[in-house]
Design a protein with these regions (language model features):
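Active-site nucleophile and cofactor-binding loops and adjacent substrate-binding regions
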Residues: 13-15, 37-42, 61-71, 150, ...
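Glycine-rich phosphate-binding loops at beta-strand->alpha-helix junctions
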Residues: 17, 28-55, 66-67, 127
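Hydrophobic/aromatic-enriched cytosolic interaction surfaces used to assemble or bind macromolecules
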Residues: 26, 47, 55-56, 69-86
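Short, well-ordered coil loops that connect the C-terminus of an alpha-helix to the N-terminus
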Residues: 32, 57-58, 227-230
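Short active-site-adjacent structural elements
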Residues: 45-47, 70, 383-387
Length: 391
């Protein structure tokens, strides 16, 4: 003022100095886009806004609530941190549930080896992912050591590749790897049944056949692995649940007698095994029920739809459920839905594959539920899956 400059020039100079200071010291050498969002309390100063327009020559957009965008940003960051913590708690809860299922599965399993006893190896594959609690008790009560193969890991996958001769589906290829890992542990027997039918109480289907590989897997493994040459006996009873409990008792009694066990002891051991399986199934069912009850009606949930062993085996599901949970999504599986208690024989009378019945039942439940979204997991080379995916 003393030198004769007007107030307008001085204010304009201050406005330009603020703009130049920001561009030189804050923006620096970084590129400036074609559209600029101008926000914060400084936006009230029209002189600074005009100086920015003059200096940059670009479009400047002013949001409606420009003076409180900082507060809005702080609120968004707070909300993000809150839900991040909440998601972590939910992930821990889900992990805890997985651990509880694993504890139920292995409740009566020790893996201890008594050198005075012979050892039976059970591969952790296919339907044995569900039936193991029964056969673990059965063989333990008959006086055997029981060894369960590990969860599918890199070593087992490599062994599967080494011993796979025919072009089969991935779950069947993994059987070779699991059996090979048991052979390395020098077991005396490999227990791997044939599964012909799997009847469920509510099903009114004309037939309930397992796939051809489940029916023939013991023969495939015996040939590929050369069990007889290695001095390992294969125990492969033919399981057919369609024929009822009496048939199952008769089949497993025959196997027990081939092991030179007392028939009364065999029956007693089998009953204890069946009880253990029922307890396992009820325990898993309760965990699933508790999880679903915690979900709100409008909460969006992913449902993993696949076969039982596809849900349990991380090598088959590629840990997709875990990845989704880490992303903050709620995830449940087909076993958490009442799919096993639905009869779809009127709609699909020729769906002879039991797993297919469950998958279609689950898909029907998801279709009729606004908050459920299905993720269908299949494995390379599965024939029935190739057909079901078109439904």
């Amino acid at each position: 003022l003393a030198e004769g400059y007007s107030k307008e020039d001085i204010c304009g100079g201050l406005a330009y100095s603020i703009v130049n200071n920001y561009l030189d010291r804050v923006v620096g050498t970084r590129a400036v886009g074609e559209k600029i969002l101008f926000q914060g309390g400084v936006t009230h100063n029209v002189a600074i806004l005009t100086a920015f327009k003059s200096r940059l020559g670009k479009e400047i957009i002013i949001p409606q609530f420009f003076s409180v965008t900082g507060a809005l940003g702080a609120a968004l960051l707070t909300m993000e941190e809150y839900y991040k913590t909440k998601v972590q708690e939910e992930i821990l809860e889900d992990i805890n549930q997985e651990e509880l299922v694993e504890k139920l599965f292995l409740r009566n399993y020790t893996g201890a080896i008594d050198k005075q006893k012979r050892t039976i190896g059970i591969p952790r594959v296919l339907f044995l992912q569900k039936l193991f609690p029964m056969f673990n008790i059965f063989f333990s009560e008959l006086g055997y050591n029981v060894v369960l193969s590990e969860m599918t890991n890199e070593k087992i996958v490599k062994l599967s590749q080494e011993y796979s001769l025919d072009e089969t589906c991935y779950p069947i290829k993994l059987v070779n790897g699991h059996v090979a890992s048991l052979i390395e542990q020098k077991v005396d027997y490999i227990f791997l049944p044939s599964l012909y039918t799997m009847k469920h109480e509510v099903s009114k289907m004309r037939e309930d056949y397992a796939c051809v590989y489940m029916q023939t897997i013991p023969k495939i493994v015996s040939k590929v692995m050369g069990l007889e040459e290695k001095g390992i006996k294969l125990l492969s009873p033919a399981l057919s649940f369609n024929f009822g409990k009496k048939y199952m008792m008769k089949t497993l009694l025959k196997m027990g007698l081939s092991l030179h066990k007392n028939p009364i002891k065999v029956v007693q051991s089998l009953k204890k095994g069946m009880k253990a399986l029922q307890e396992f199934e009820k325990g898993v069912e309760k965990l699933g029920k508790d999880l679903i009850e915690k979900l709100s009606k409008d909460e969006k949930v992913f449902v993993i739809i696949t076969r039982t062993y596809g849900v349990v085996d991380k090598g088959l599901n590629m840990e997709i459920p875990k990845i989704l949970k880490k992303m903050g999504y709620k995830v449940i599986t087909l076993s958490h839905l009442p799919a096993h208690s639905m009869d779809i024989s009127n709609e699909y009378p020729n769906m002879y594959w039991p797993f297919g019945q469950h998958i279609l039942s689950g898909a029907k439940i998801v279709r009729n539920s606004e908050n459920l979204y299905a993720i269908y997991l299949t494995n390379h080379g599965c024939g029935p899956d190739g057909i079901i995916s078109h439904y």
